[in-house]
Amino acid sequence: MAMTNQEKFKVLADQIKVSNQLDQTIIEKGELTRVDVSNKNRTWEFQITLPYFLSHEDYLIFTNAITEEFKEIAKVDWHFTIQDTSNQDEHAIKYFGHCIEHTALSPKVKGQLKQKRLIMSGNVLKVMTSNDIERNHFDKVCNGSLVKAFRKCGFDIDKVVFETDDSSSYDDLASLEAHIQEEDEKSAREATEKIEKIKAEKAKQQDNNESNVDKCQIGKPIQIDNIKPIESIIEEEFKVAIEGVIFDINLKELKSGRHIVELKVTDYTDSLVLKMFTRKNKDDLDHFKALSVGKWVRAQGRIEEDTFVRDLVMMMTDIEEIKKTPKQDKAEEKRVEFHLHTSMSQMDGIPNISAYVNQAAKWGHKAIAVTDHNVVQAFPDAHGAAEKNGIKMIYGMEGMLVDDGVPIAYKPTDRDLKEATYVVFDVETTGLSNQYDQIIELAAVKVKDGEIIDKFERFSNPHEKLSETIINLTHITDDMLTDAPEIEEVLTEFKEWVGDAIFVAHNASFDMGFIDTGYERLGFGPSTNGVIDTLELSRTINTEYGKHGLNFLAKKYGVELTQHHRAIYDTESTAYIFIKMVQQMKELGVTNHKDINQKLSNEDAYKRARPTHVTLIVQTQEGLKNLFKIVSASLVKYYYRTPRIPRSLLNEYREGILVGTACDEGELFTAVMQRDQSEVEKIAKYYDFIEVQPPKLYQDLIDRELIRDTETLYEIYERILKAGESTGIPVIATGNAHYLYEHDAIARKILIASQPGNPLNRSTLPEAHFRTTDEMLDEFHFLGEEKAHEIVVKNTNELADRIEKVIPIKDQLFTPRMDGANEEIRELSYTNAKKLYGEDLPQIVIDRLEKELASIIGNGFSVIYLISQRLVKKSLDDGYLVGSRGSVGSSFVATMTEITEVNPLPPHYICPNCKTSEFFDDGSVGSGFDLPDKQCSTCGAELIKEGQDIPFETFLGFKGDKVPDIDLNFSGEYQPNAHNYTKVLFGEDKVFRAGTIGTVAEKTAFGYVKGYLNDQGIHKRGAEIDRLVKGCTGVKRTTGQHPGGIIVVPDYMDIYDFTPIQYPADDQSASWMTTHFDFHSIHDNVLKLDILGHDDPTMIRMLQDLSGIDPKTIPVDDKETMQIFSSPESLGVTEEEILCKTGTFGVPEFGTGFVRQMLEDTKPTTFSELVQISGLSHGTDVWLGNAQELIRSGICDLSSVIGCRDDIMVYLMYAGLEPSMAFKTMESVRKGKGLTEEMIDAMKENNVPDWYLDSCLKIKYMFPKAHAAAYVLMAVRIAYFKVHHPLYYYASYFTIRASDFDLITMIKDKESIKNTVKDMYSRYMDLGKKEKDVLTVLEIMNEMAHRGFRMQPISLEKSQAFDFIIEGDTLIPPFISVPGLGENVAKRIVEAREDGPFLSKEDLNKKAGLSQKIIEYLDDLGSLPNLPDKAQLSIFDM
C-alpha cells in the first residue's frame, strides 16, 4: 500500500533528523506532496505542505537539515504551501530578512531594506520607505524578486509595494534621534538579556559540572586522505574536507536558543569561513566553546556561495579539533638570536616583541635580542615579556652609522687649484665590487687652465659575458670588448698618461676603488695622486640643491650631457662641471687642494655621508643610558632623512655597548666588496662582534647583480671569517628576523609595497623568519659542521654570557622636588579656607583638610598639587579660566589651592561677611547650588551656596595613596602658553611632551591589502583578506604626541634615566620634543601633567571680553538660565520655531541630539540634576537600558538614579554601609565588574532596593562626579550668556566652536533657514559628517534668527579674518567662514585692504590671492556689490 503524503513527510523528518526538534503537530500533519527531480541539473525540489508557518528558526533548521542530508546526491531546493495563513502578517515580518537574502539584490540594497518598516495589507506587503527617491529606487531594483522569495516560504503574497512612510517624516532632528534611540535601546535590552542568559547558563553548567568538553568533536570522523588545500576550493562542491588554524570565532545566538557558529580558518594557502547551526538538545555549543583562536581544526562540509557576502563558505557537517605539532628547536645546544626586528621597526617588522620572546622560550633559548631599526620603543614590552617567560632579554638597536664628514679631497697635495692639471675620469665595470668585478671601459680628459687639453679612452676585455643589466646600463656589448686589450695594458698606459695630475671623478670613491685595486694587482701600489670628488663637492657648495646626480648638475650648470653612463661622455660633462666648480671654490676662498676639506667642512657634513648599518647591543646598565643618548641624538640632532649616528657620537657614548657589523648594508660587508683584506681587517677592529647572516638573506644581492653568484657569496663569507680570526673578534650568525614564521612573509611584503619609495621594493624580499638552531646550522652547512656550530651556537651563547641583566624601565615613581612644597600646600589650603570660612574654621572643613593633607603630604604628592596650582594661577592671572577634568574636584585641598572650582564638601551656606556656615551632610541636598536663596541670620547678607558632596576617596583611593592624576582644561588658545610655562617652572631640559606611537589600524591595513592584491592581480576570498589585514594591523606607522601630556623629569635625574627623546613624527621643525617611549610605558615612573586644550575656557574668555562680565560672578542658579534645559521659553522662542523642546543648542555638554533627548525625558530643574545628566550621558550602560527605563517606569526620578561613580559611594554610606565597603562597591561597578556576593549581601542588609542592585550590575563605565560638575559649571555660565546676552553668545559660538558654515543659507530670513533645517532633518540618515556639522550650525542660526537677530553677508570692508563681529542686531561673519578659504588667505585679505579698497574682482584676486571659485561664492553671497570684474582706467590715472 502506497504511503500517504503525511507518512512521506514523517519519513523525511526522521531521515533528516528533525523529528524531535520541530513541533509535533508539524510532524503529524505535514505533507510531502511531490519531489521534482532534474537529473540533468542534479536538483531536487521538495514540495511540502504544512498546517501553519514554521517559526523562522525552525525554518532554518529544517532547510539546513534537508540540504545537508542530500548534498552528495543533488542540490536541494523546496517550496512550502501553508494551510493556515491567518498569522501570515506576523511571520512575514520575521521572515523578511531571510527572504531578502535569497534574492539577487546587492548587499547595500539588502542592508537598506532590512531597516524598513513593514505593513501587511491583505495579500500585499508594504515596505515603508523614507522618501520618494528611495521608493522609486526600490521599485526599480527589486523587480518582483521579493514576491518569489516569500512564496517559496509559503506566504500568500501577491505583490510587494514600496510606499513613502509619513511617520518617518519627523518634525525635527530630536524626534528622529528619539526614534533611532528607542530602537537602539530595544536592541541593547535584547542583547543584554541574551548576554545575561548566556552568563547564567555558563555559570549553571560550571556549578553542576554538566560540561566537561575540552576538545571539539562534532559529527563523523574525517578521513585525512580527503583533505584539500583551501586554495584549491574555487567553486561550490558537495563534500570537501580541509584543515586549518582558527583566526576568528563568532558565536551568534538565535531566538530559539540555538547558535550559528562562524569560524575563519587558514591553512596558509588561503582562508575560508566555516559555518554551522548548533543542534537542539546537543552539546554542540560546548564543543565550539572549547575552540579558540590559534587552535587547529579539521572540518568537512558543503561549499556554497553565501549570497550576502558573495563569497564561498563551508556549511560544516563535521568538525574536530586536531593537534598540530608546533615548530620546534630540536638542537641539544640552542643558539641565541642577536638581530631581530619587531613591529616597532617602522612598516617593516611584523610581530610584537612578546611573540618572539614566547617563541624563543618555547624553543628553550636562554636569551634573545631585540634590534629594531633606529628605535628602542620595544624595550618596555620586551622587559615584561622576558620576565614573564624567564628568558634573558638583550636590548639593542640597528642604527645608521655615518662618518662625521665625507672628504671632498683625498690625499691632499699642496697644489694651487688654478695652476693644477686635472684628470677627470670615469670607469664602466661589470659590477659594483672592485674586488670581484672588472673595468670594461676607462675614459678620461685632461684639464689645464680651464680647458680640456687631452683625452684617453680604452675598452678592456673582461673575458666574461656581460649581464643584460650592465649592457643596458653602459650601452657596451660583448662584441665591443672582444678585441679589446687586457686591463693590465690599459691601466699601465693610463698611469703613465695621468702623471702627477689630480684625479677628479663624480662619486670618486667608486671609480678610485677600481683604479687602486687595479694598480695594486699590477704591483704599483695604490695611487698617490690627489683626488677631488665632484659629488661631495656639489653637496657642500650647492646645499640648496636637493639632487646632485650628473644629469641634474649638467642641467644646472648648463652643460650638455649627451650619453649618460658611457665613460667618455660622462667624463667630458664632469670636466665642464668641475671647471665651473673651481671658480665657485675660488669665490669661497678655497685656492689650494690641501685646504679643500678644512675650508669647506661644516657642521652638517654628516648629512653627506652614506649611512651604513650598525648593531648596538647594551652590555651594562650604563650602556642602556648611553644608548638612550645615542638614540636621542640621532633622532633630534643628527636626523637627515633617517636618524644618523656619527662615529664621533658612538665613540663618545660607547661605554657599556657592544658594537656589531650588522647586515649586508653594514660597513664591513661593504668593505669586503670594495677593499682588500688588510683594509677589511682594519675596519673589523672597530667592532666588538662580526655578524654573518644566512645566504638566503643575501639572495637579493645576487638577484640585483651586486654579487656575481653563490660562489662569490661564499668567498665573501670566507673573507669575513678570516677577518674575525685574524683580529680575534667573534663572528656570530644572526637571522635578521622580521617575522616569526615563513607564512608571515606576505604581511611584510604588503607593508613594504605600501611604501612606493622604499628601496626594498626593487627586489624580492629575502626569507627573514625567526630561525631555529637547526635551520641556522643548515644555512651554514657549506662552512663545515665545526665552523657552522661555532658561529651559530658557541659564539652567540658566549656573547650572551658577556651581557649583564639590564632593566630598561624604572620600578617606582620619581616626582620633581620643590623646596617647601609640603608647607606651601598646607599654608595655601588653610589661608584660602580661612578667607572663605573664617578664622574659626568649621570642624567639617578642618577634618576634610587634615584627612587630605595627611595623604597628600604623607605620600609625597604635595609637589604635584603645587605644580598644578602654579599652572592654574598663571592662566587665571593671564585672564583665562581653567576647567578641571577627572576626579581632582573630589579634593578639597585642590579647591582651596584654586586648582579646581568644584567644592567637594557637602552642600552648605557661607556668609561672605561674618563667615557663618551651615552644612547639609545627610544627603538631602544634591548640590549646594540648589539650596534656596537665604540671608545670613547674623548680619543679613546674602549667603553663598557651595558644595557638591564628593568623597575624597574617588581621587586618591580609599587609603589616599593613589598617584594623583590632575587633568586641567585650559583655553585652546592659551594651551601653548601653559605648556611653555612648565619650561619656566622646571627648565627646558626637564619637560617633554608625552610621546605616542601610531600603529597601522585595521581600516588602513585593509587598504594596504586591497592595494597589494590589486597591484599583483590576485583575487582572494574575504576570509583571506581578513587574515592578511590582521597580519598587518598593529605595526608601527608613525609617532606623535599626547594632546596635552607633559612629562616632568625631576631635577636630580635626567630624561635619559627614563627614555630617549625625539620629535613627533620625526618633524624636526616641531617646537617640542617628546618621549621616545610611548608615555604609557613610563606612566608610573615620571610625573605627567595633563594640560589639555578646550573650547569652553576660550569661549568664556571671548564672552568676558565682549561683555565685561566676570564669569565667576554669574549666578549658577539663575532661573531663566536653568529653564532652557527643559524649555526654550526663556529664549523668547517656541518649540515649533526652533524645532526643539529645549533651548540648549550650542550649550556645551547639553547640545547634542542624544543629550537633548535625555533633557526632554527628565526635565531637569537643578544643578545637581544637570550633573546627573552629564554623568549619565558619559557613562556606558548607565542611561540606555538602565536609568532611562527606571525613570520611564516611574520607579525613581532623575535625582535618585545612579548618574556618577561617586553617587554610589555616597548613597551607600548614607544607607549604612561601611565606607570601605561603599568604596569597593563603587570601584567595582565603575569598572564594569558588577557586584560580588559580599557587596550584594551588604547592600541587602542595609535595605538598598533591588532596582539599585540591578542598575549596578548593568553598568560598564561611570563618569566621575567632579568632572561632571566642572563641565556643568562651565555650561551653565555659557548658557547664562545665551539667555541674557544673546549676540555675545552667538558671536562667540560661531567664532570658537563652529567650523562648517553655509553662509548662503545663514543670511536668509528665518523661515527659509528653518525650512532648510527641516529638509536636512528629513534626510538626516543620508547626510555625511560635513553636512551634519553644517546642520548643527544652522540649528543655532535658526534659533538666532527667531530671536530677532540676523547674519549679514561677508563684508570686504568690515569682516575680520577669524572672528564674528557684532553690528547692531546682526553678526558679520569672518573670511575664514567662507568654505574653502584658509587661514593664510583670510589674513591676507585683511592685510591687503589696509593698503586701500579693492577696485575690482581682478584686484581682489591679485592682492588677496582669492581663487575664482571663492570670488564667485562671495558674489553669490552679495559681498561684492558694484565691484566690477576689472578696474576701469580713468583719464586722470594716465
From Swiss-Prot:
**Taking the first listed entry, what is the main subcellular location of this protein, grouped into a coarse class?**
cytoplasm
The protein's UniProt keywords, in alphabetical order, are:
Cytoplasm, DNA replication, DNA-directed DNA polymerase, Exonuclease, Hydrolase, Nuclease, Nucleotidyltransferase, Transferase
Q: What does this protein do?
A: Required for replicative DNA synthesis. This DNA polymerase also exhibits 3' to 5' exonuclease activity.
Which GO MF term does the entry hold, naming one?
Answer: DNA-directed DNA polymerase activity
In terms of Gene3D superfamilies, this protein maps to:
1.10.150.870, 3.30.1900.20, 6.10.140.1510, Metal-dependent hydrolases, Nucleic acid-binding proteins, PolC, middle finger domain, Ribonuclease H-like superfamily/Ribonuclease H
Q: What broad taxonomic lineage does this protein's source fall under?
A: Bacteria, Bacillati, Bacillota, Bacilli, Bacillales
Q: Which family does it belong to?
A: Belongs to the DNA polymerase type-C family. PolC subfamily.
Q: What is this protein called?
A: DNA polymerase III PolC-type
One cellular component term (GO) for this entry is:
cytoplasm
Organism of this sequence: Staphylococcus haemolyticus (strain JCSC1435)
- Which subcellular locations apply to this protein? Cytoplasm
One GO biological process this protein is involved in is: DNA-templated DNA replication
Report the residue ranges that make up the Exonuclease domain in this protein.
422-578
Which reaction(s) does its UniProt entry say it catalyses?
DNA(n) + a 2'-deoxyribonucleoside 5'-triphosphate = DNA(n+1) + diphosphate
- Which SMART domains does this entry report, sorted A to Z? EXOIII, POLIIIAc
Q: What is its EC number?
A: 2.7.7.7
